[in-house]
Swiss-Prot record:
GO terms for cellular component: cytoplasm. This is Gamma-glutamyl phosphate reductase. Signal peptide: none annotated. It is found in: Cytoplasm. Its EC number is 1.2.1.41. InterPro entries: Ald_DH/histidinol_DH, Ald_DH_C, Ald_DH_N, Aldehyde_DH_dom, Glu-5-SA_DH, GPR_dom. It catalyses: L-glutamate 5-semialdehyde + phosphate + NADP(+) = L-glutamyl 5-phosphate + NADPH + H(+). HAMAP family: ProA (MF_00412). It comes from Laribacter hongkongensis (strain HLHK9). SUPFAM superfamilies: ALDH-like. Keywords: Amino-acid biosynthesis, Cytoplasm, NADP, Oxidoreductase, Proline biosynthesis.
Length: 420
């Protein structure tokens, strides 16, 4: 069978399975999730063996050490996959929720009901644990899914898929509800993102190049973010003792995450008091600093490299930080909206009016006051789990949890009313 026919068959099976899932009750979906978790624990040795083969091949192919690290499963990460599925089972089921009821002058009562999206295509790279996470989230939200993991994790993903299918079958749900592509042909991605008759939304998780390509070529909606160029602005009215640990955590807790601060903006009035202290923290932790002329004058040209225009635009995902001293809240908002990626941005201030204005005018999916940008996360937001973070303005925005994998439809109750 050729690739086009294979993908069409996959899509048809997913669409049929999605209709069955939409009818499944919470108890059945939870039973499947728990059975998946049990299967993963029981078959842990098989998963680790398959993963060891993937890792061996990746090392032989010269895959970057960071990618090999993401690819590698351990007993702990396998246990974490099982626990993650059990946590998803414990979350409230959004499907079928009704609300916003109101009576109209005609006598009809209308409201909204939350329903599954249908079929979700998820494209990701080296992390095999995403296979279990994505399958669990889509299932709980009543969606079928088609998963295309990185070719370097092919054996691992197939082994995890076998456990997922075992759990679905144990709960008498169609195994086509979760399908992991059984091909490493990259052309399959191009077909997956251009099947609107079978796929309702695409969620890409990976590098900027992958996401940009999918966004440009997809013929179905895409839930995505391209960059995590996050800012923290230390305002003229900031409590500097509060600002220090927040700015430290936002940059140094983890360097490679999309909610890590990449640019620090500091009001000129507090720069002399604040920058030497926070920059020493960064330097002690091995962070490379790139700053404006004022920053370099305050800290020392030998300690701070000159920042370029490109630095204000860059998500480093590394121990590198851009620093700029600015003259006002207006300038901070303007800088963030011009250079930022609409992900997560923070103001440190004790001024209520300034905080309100920052919240209102900064055009990002998460905007924070006096807290680290590292909190922009589905778990920290109480969503329990997330499929990713969206910086788009339509449908889901910010961390996308179970509700973000559903939509709403209008429902109307009447008693024989007709329109006059």
């Amino acid at each position: 069978m050729d690739l086009h026919s294979y993908m069409q068959d996959l899509g048809r099976a997913a669409r049929a399975a999605s209709r069955e899932l939409a009818r499944a009750d919470t108890r059945t979906k939870n039973a499947a999730l728990l059975a998946m978790a049990d299967a993963i624990e029981r078959d842990a040795a098989k998963l680790l063996a398959a993963n060891a083969d993937d890792v061996k091949a990746a090392v032989a192919a010269g895959l970057a050490p960071a990618m090999v690290d993401r690819l590698t499963l351990t007993e702990k990460t396998v246990a974490g996959m099982a626990e993650g599925l059990r946590q998803i089972a414990s979350l409230p089921d959004p499907v079928g929720e009704m609300g916003e009821f109101a009576y109209r002058p005609s006598g009809i009562q209308l409201g909204k009901m939350r329903v599954p999206l249908g079929v979700i295509g998820i494209i990701y790279e080296a992390r095999p644990n995403v296979t279990a996470d994505a399958a669990g989230l889509c299932l709980k939200a009543g969606n079928a899914c088609i998963l295309r993991g990185g070719s370097e994790a092919f054996r691992s993903n197939q082994a995890i898929a076998a456990c997922v299918h075992e759990g679905l079958a144990a709960a008498s749900l169609p195994t086509a509800a979760v399908q992991v592509l059984e091909t490493t042909d990259r052309a399959a991605v191009g077909l997956l993102i251009t099947m609107p008759e079978y796929v309702d939304v695409i969620v890409p998780r990976g590098g900027k190049g992958l996401i940009a390509r999918i966004s440009a070529e997809a013929r179905v909606p895409v839930i995505k973010h391209l960059d995590g160029n996050c800012h923290t602005y230390v305002d003229v009215d900031a409590d500097l003792e509060k600002a220090l640990p927040v700015c430290d955590n936002a940059k140094t807790q983890r360097y490679g995450t999309c909610n890590t601060m990449e640019t620090l903006l500091v009001h000129e009035v507090v720069a002399e008091a604040f920058l030497p202290a926070i920059c020493q923290v960064y330097l002690d932790k091995g962070v490379e600093l790139r700053g404006c002329a004022t920053t370099r004058a305050l800290i020392g040209a030998d300690k701070v490299q000159p920042a370029t225009e490109e630095d204000w635009l860059t998500e480093y995902a590394a121990p590198i930080l851009a620093i700029k001293v600015i003259d006002s809240l207006d300038t901070a908002i303007s800088h963030i909206n011009h250079y930022g990626s609409h992900h997560t941005d923070v103001i440190i201030t004790e001024n209520y009016s300034s905080a309100r204005r920052f919240l209102r005018e900064v055009d990002s999916s998460s905007v924070m006051v006096n807290a680290s940008s590292r909190f922009a996360d589905g778990f920290e937001y109480g969503l329990g789990a997330e499929i990713g973070i969206s910086t788009d303005k339509i449908h889901a925005r910010g961390p996308v949890g179970l509700k973000g994998l559903t939509s709403e439809k209008w429902i109307v109750f009447g008693d024989g009313q007709v329109r006059g």
